[in-house]
Structures are given as C-alpha cells and as structure tokens.
Amino acid sequence: MPSPSYLGRFAPSPTGPLHFGSLLAAFGSWLLARHAGGQWCVRIEDIDPPRAEPGASERQLRTLTAFGLHSDLPVIRQSERDAAYTAAINRLLETGQAFECSCSRADLAGMGGIHHACVAPLGARRAVRLRVPPQSPVGFDDALHGRVLQDVYADVGDVVLRRADGYWAYQLAVVVDDAAQGITDVVRGADLLDSTPRQMLLQRALGVPQPRYLHLPLMLDGDGRKLSKSHGAPALDDTDPLPALHAAWAGLGQRPDALPRRATVTTLLQQAVRHFSPQLLPRQRQRDRATCAYERQRD
C-alpha cells in the first residue's frame, strides 16, 4: 500500500442514514485531505450488529456519492476484519498487555464504572481489556484544540477491547484499521476527543504509528444536543445536495461568499478546495447558524 504524506478517512457506523452532523465530519475531513494534497477514504464501522440498520451502509455510500465525496481507496468494512482484530488481541494477551475479565457494569458501578482490578471471578462470558497501569497520563496536540491531557488510568481504567458478548470494541477496531490503512490524519467530531488518549495507549501497545488528530466542533440541535439519529436528526437529501453543502461550509467557519450559489456539485467542490482555510475552523460546539440555515432550506 502506498504511504502518502496525508491520508484521511471518514468512518460512519451503519446505524441509519447520514445527517447534517455526519456531513460536517465527512466534508471537513475531505476538505482537509484535499487542502494537504492528500488522499481520503471511507471505512464502514459495522462491528456492532445489534445497532446496525439493514441497508444503511449502502445508503450512506450512495449519499456520499451524491454529495461528490468519493473514496480514493476501496471502501473497508470492519465486519470483514475479524482476523486482524483477533491477531491484535492474541498479541496483547501473549505479552500480558491485555487480560480476560468477567466484570459486568453492575460489578463496577461502585467504582464509577472504572476498572482497575477484577472484582468478579472469571466466568463463561469474558471480555478482553487493555491493561492500563497507574499514572498513565497521555497528552497530544490536537490540530484545532491544542494540548489535550488525560490520565487514562484515573479517568477510564482498563479499556475494553473485546466485549463479553464477543463483539469487537470500537477502540480496538479503529486503532487496528487506522494502522492497517496507513491513516496519517484522523479528523472527526469532538465527541471522540476523550477517546484519543486510550487509542494512543493501544497504539503504543501494538507498536503502530500515531496519526495526527483534529476534532471538529459538533453541530447541536435546538435543545443543545448533538445532532444524531437517536435525537431525530433528519436524513440528508440525496436529490438536492447543494443546500446542505453550503450549510456545512458555513458550519466549518468558511466564508459563505466563496462558493457559487448555483453550480454543479463538482464545481462547488472544486471551489471549496480552492478557497478552504483550516485557520477558519471553529473550536466551539454550538447551535450554529449553519444548522439553522440548513433547516430553513429544508422547510
């Protein structure tokens, strides 16, 4: 696989159609990749079958195509990556960096859900956790938010890598796949900012490279909640991408007058790449004017 100086990605979970918040992350990561002269790819994070919606991943890919956001590399599906995750787990178990655990959430409730030592005997249902030693501060420089520091031992505890029901945990799958694909830059929503330190610990344990990180501000609904399917965020309209693209451009802090009001999707994206400025990206999550504008255009 080639090793570009910049390879970004958009990695949706197939729990429903893409919405405006999804577009902000996809468009933002795509623009940053194009601005850097790099590549951008799509990965379907379908490791949680109980939450997956039938046909959702295909619809998500159709939406990205309608919005002109094409993956430069073949689309990867995490549901087809069991062998890679198993190999990573076995390696960590063999080196003592991971261990089996039968502690349930109820068992850990008295510790605030944070696992520092097993309190339940091993049973038939066993998770696998990354062993996090005491005093495990992890710091990194986010390209938008600056220095971020977290004591993973105190704040998170031993990290689940494989759930007791046998499904892979997000933290393991994302680290293994970012490394396998050669992802150099992770651009995603700020709701995943506090997941980054535990992913960095896992990267160190596996001996894989650490990407650069940039966490975009979240788009909030009228009640101040993150736009999401669970909170009723409407699906993007594949038949009319321009209003949502204009609104997402504004949500990324860019100058609205830089893009033509009437254009093909291809022309609009060409102009977006030409005029995009990372220095204008906002840092604060908010009920953004872009969200309001997009909703007005839909009404």
Curated annotation (Swiss-Prot):
Any one Gene Ontology molecular-function term assigned to this protein's record: ATP binding
InterPro entries: Glu-Q_tRNA(Asp)_Synthase, Glu/Gln-tRNA-synth, Glu/Gln-tRNA-synth_Ib_cat-dom, GluQ/Sye, Rossmann-like_a/b/a_fold
Keyword DNA-binding tagged: no
GO biological process: glutamyl-tRNA aminoacylation; tRNA modification
Motif ('HIGH' region): 12-22
Requisite cofactors: Zn(2+)
Basic and acidic residues composition bias: residue spans: 285-299
Binding residue positions for ATP: K229
Pfam family, one: tRNA-synt_1c
Motif annotated as 'KMSKS' region, chain positions: 226-230
Keyword set, alphabetical order: Aminoacyl-tRNA synthetase, ATP-binding, Ligase, Metal-binding, Nucleotide-binding, Zinc
Region (Disordered): 279-299
Details of cofactor binding: Binds 1 zinc ion per subunit.
One Gene Ontology cellular component annotation held by this UniProt entry: cytosol
Binding residues for L-glutamate: R9, F10, A11, P12, S13, E45, Y170, R188
EC code: 6.1.1.-
Binding site for Zn(2+): C101, C103, C118
Family: Belongs to the class-I aminoacyl-tRNA synthetase family. GluQ subfamily.
Function, in words: Catalyzes the tRNA-independent activation of glutamate in presence of ATP and the subsequent transfer of glutamate onto a tRNA(Asp). Glutamate is transferred on the 2-amino-5-(4,5-dihydroxy-2-cyclopenten-1-yl) moiety of the queuosine in the wobble position of the QUC anticodon.
Protein name stated in the entry: Glutamyl-Q tRNA(Asp) synthetase
UniProt source species: Xanthomonas oryzae pv. oryzae (strain KACC10331 / KXO85)
